[in-house]
From Swiss-Prot:
NCBIfam families: argB (TIGR00761), PRK04531.1-1 (NF003386), PRK04531.1-2 (NF003387). Residues 1-252 are annotated as: Acetylglutamate kinase. This is Acetylglutamate kinase. GO terms for cellular component: cytoplasm. Gene3D superfamilies: 3.40.630.30, Acetylglutamate kinase-like (3.40.1160.10). In the N-terminal section; belongs to the acetylglutamate kinase family. ArgB subfamily. The record marks K26, K231 as: Transition state stabilizer. Substrate binds at A59, G60, R81, N170. Pathway: Amino-acid biosynthesis; L-arginine biosynthesis; N(2)-acetyl-L-ornithine from L-glutamate: step 2/4. One of its GO terms (biological process) is L-arginine biosynthetic process. It comes from Xylella fastidiosa (strain 9a5c). The keyword RNA-binding does not apply. The keyword Cytoplasm applies.
Length: 421
């Protein structure tokens, strides 16, 4: 699935968190119905490696089926399912049944899991006249969840609420997940879907979204509308209320481990991210922090007087100095002198966000990379072409004339290294 180093890096990061701050996993009813084997396999794997996710589920498709069988027509208003007193018995039965089915499937997989179908969400009527027995959450009680976590058992929570007087209310599962996340402040929020992520205009999964640099442009795209636009807006609102390190992952149940434990992931990773600083002179940057970023990323030392002797064309640096691109000029084409990303920012999409901003302003570009550089797979995908030398791979973008490419290759061969072991 990934290198042992990658998996160990993420496992160490997750294991250092308080148990209830690891992850909230939102599971839709369609996943429970269609993909429960992959779901339970992935959740069981997390427990095997010492991590306990908090699972919250809906049961929309199952409820639709039961209501149809009972001759009751589904009615929604403003996205909320109208829940009349005569349908509440069916709602309760469906949620309890779905919850127990997931518990039993987890137990068959050797996992420990706890059924929680009440006692978490205190609620009041959203608007009884309009929606019937639909609740708006007024408080979240963590005691049942914490008891489950202390027993190293996966809490499996149904999105049902109760009024202070004990009336059961139907709670929208997305709303319940948002409120639970707001109280828990988890490191990861995971939405499991059949699509495996947010899709772009070509129907391909968007790997990562850095909201600080991409949200305004993304939300204006013609292919972002309806449910997808609403989902992105909801995720932004969710992350705005969470610590900077929190993130949302949207993936398939079968790909959950890959999304969590590899830099590349498998799905869409959404983070608030960091603003990107653009500089054209070294004096506009915090050079000690930039030096630390470069040396930590490459695990090598910059040559003495690097900043004094290197003519800067442009630098793109994340505001917390966790990722940077440095451009200089060798000849007439911008030269990518450094692309550095700290270990703890790997897999966040932060490096890609900085890279994308640089590329928007830099149609022509060339750079070199050592043969054993782990970023080479990324460079192959991002470049228009490459050439192998004894010690370097030379990559380029936007160069179409052989003579120009030849000059860039020659520059790379002659340019002395600026990092030493």
């Amino acid at each position: 699935m990934a290198s042992t180093k990658e998996i160990s890096q993420y496992l160490k990061r997750f294991s250092q968190l308080d148990a209830k701050r690891f992850a909230v996993v939102k599971v839709g009813g369609a996943v429970l119905r269609d993909d429960v084997d992959a779901l339970t396999s992935s959740l069981s794997f997390l427990q095997e490696v010492g991590l306990t996710p908090i699972v919250l589920h809906g049961a929309g498709p199952q409820l639709d089926e039961e209501l149809t069988a009972a001759g009751i027509q589904k009615k929604t208003v403003n996205g909320f399912r109208v829940t009349l007193p005569e349908t509440m018995a069916i709602v309760r039965k469906v949620f309890h049944t779905s919850n127990l089915q997931l518990i039993e499937a987890l137990q068959r997989n050797g996992a420990r899991a706890t059924s929680i179908t009440g006692g978490v969400f205190e609620a009041h009527y959203l608007d009884q006249e309009t929606y019937g027995l639909v609740g708006e959450i007024s408080a979240v009680n963590l005691a049942p969840i914490e008891a489950s976590l202390r027993a190293a058992s996966i809490p499996v929570i149904a999105s049902l609420g109760e009024t202070p007087s004990g009336q059961i209310l139907n709670i929208n599962a997305d709303v319940a997940a948002n409120e639970l996340v707001h109280v828990l402040q988890p490191y990861k929020i995971i939405f499991l879907t059949g699509t495996g992520g947010l899709l772009d205009a070509d129907g391909k999964i968007i790997n990562s979204i850095n909201l600080s640099t991409e949200y305004e442009q993304l939300i204006q795209q013609p292919w972002v509308y309806g449910g997808m636009k609403l989902k992105i807006e909801q995720i932004k609102h969710l992350l705005d209320r969470l610590p900077l390190e929190s993130s949302v992952s949207i993936t398939r149940p079968a790909d959950l481990a890959k999304e969590l434990f590899t830099h590349k992931g498998s799905g869409t990773l959404v983070r608030r991210g960091e603003r990107v600083i653009r500089a054209t002179t070294w004096k506009d940057l915090d050079l000690p922090r930039l030096q630390h970023l470069i040396q930590s990323s490459f695990r090598r030392t910059l040559i003495p007087h690097y900043f004094e002797t290197t003519p800067l064309l442009r630098a793109y640096v994340s505001e917390n100095y966790r990722a940077a691109v440095i451009l200089t000029k060798l000849g007439n084409v911008p030269y990518l002198d450094k692309f550095a990303v700290l270990d703890d920012a790997q897999g966040e999409g932060l490096g890609r966000a900085v890279w994308s901003i640089m590329r928007e302003e830099t149609p022509q570009l060339f750079w070199r990379s050592r043969h054993n550089n782990q970023a080479n797979a990324f460079y192959y995908a991002e470049s228009d072409g490459y050439y192998k030398q004894d010690h370097w791979k030379i990559f380029w973008n936007g160069l179409h004339h052989f003579q120009q490419i030849q000059q860039c290759v020659a520059h790379c061969a002659q340019h002395p290294p600026t990092l030493i072991d």
